[in-house]
């Protein structure tokens, strides 16, 4: 009898785990951010979420991840990238936005059961890295203001997070404590969030029920664990000195200074506390 009960408990736990690996909703978000030249980005992200876990990602990038998840597919993709880079070098101008690439290689996986986020990203064009972060680094102050987004009544909340002040709008009508990027921890789904300077934000433009699997990241074993601030410092160094990054990889080119993108401290990342 005891063995039967144990089996049933294990069976029920297995069912629960399997159920929790599926999303309840899928939300599409438009990113608000700008290139160094002031041009607005036009990136799209999706959030697959249920009450205990979620995955935030760019669907185009995940499609490329799928195509390059085999050795042959990855080799073909790298050949295409190298050919594009050599063509740009021959023209005397490098624009990485025109290279075959993952449009936005960022993945944010959240687990409320563990109160941990796992963030996967790429340094440069070919260094997969990841780090983890506790939920406790984000705390909110809920206000009184309300507005309607996609037909849902939303409530204002504010937080100071990793160097920027953010204002979010969440709806208790969808009781999933999640949102775009790393945002979480409010008593309802976050449909809009913007930083005080207007340089970054996310706005929901579609919500639907979903039973899609919340899978991990393709090739997760290839990602190297790093420190969050160290990753941001490395990204900043690459942005400030892209030629040095190429030369460190054995790519020696001569590009006139006017063909290199200019960056300044005002053109900073979404997180600024790495300095």
Please provide the spans of the model-predicted regions.
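Bacterial Sec-dependent N-terminal signal peptides
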Residues: 1-25
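Extracellular or lumenal secretory-pathway regions
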Residues: 20-137, 143-146, 153, 198-275
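Hydrophobic residues in beta-strands and at strand termini
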Residues: 142-143, 170
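Structural motif
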Residues: 149-150, 161
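Gly/Pro-enriched, hydrophobic low-complexity segments
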Residues: 155-218
